[in-house]
Amino acid sequence: MSIFNYLRRRASTASVAKERLQIIISHERSQRNTPDYLPKLQEEILAVIAKYVNISRDQVSVNLERMEDSAVLELNITMPDKALEDSNS
């Protein structure tokens, strides 16, 4: 292994690390703009749905997208095949 190969490999590692840091920073910036009530809203929505359907926390996703003149609240729920009533019978 020559010194040039060693230095070339480190450069690619540095670029990968830089790319990963940019992704992390972008994610952190997007999280900073979320309102404080969003986690509480997600918990309350989960509680209401859990009354009727057997569902876990990771099956409910709440996102807020802000645009210039509006905001969109996106709610994604992965529903199971059957409701609680069907499984209790």
UniProtKB/Swiss-Prot annotation:
The name this protein goes by in its record: Cell division topological specificity factor
Originating gene: minE
Keywords: Cell cycle, Cell division
Gene3D superfamilies named in the record: Cell division topological specificity factor MinE
Function field: Prevents the cell division inhibition by proteins MinC and MinD at internal division sites while permitting inhibition at polar sites. This ensures cell division at the proper site by restricting the formation of a division septum at the midpoint of the long axis of the cell.
Pfam families, sorted: MinE
Gene Ontology BP, a term: cell division
Organism: Legionella pneumophila (strain Corby)
Lineage of the species this protein comes from: Bacteria, Pseudomonadati, Pseudomonadota, Gammaproteobacteria, Legionellales
Family stated for the protein in its record: Belongs to the MinE family.
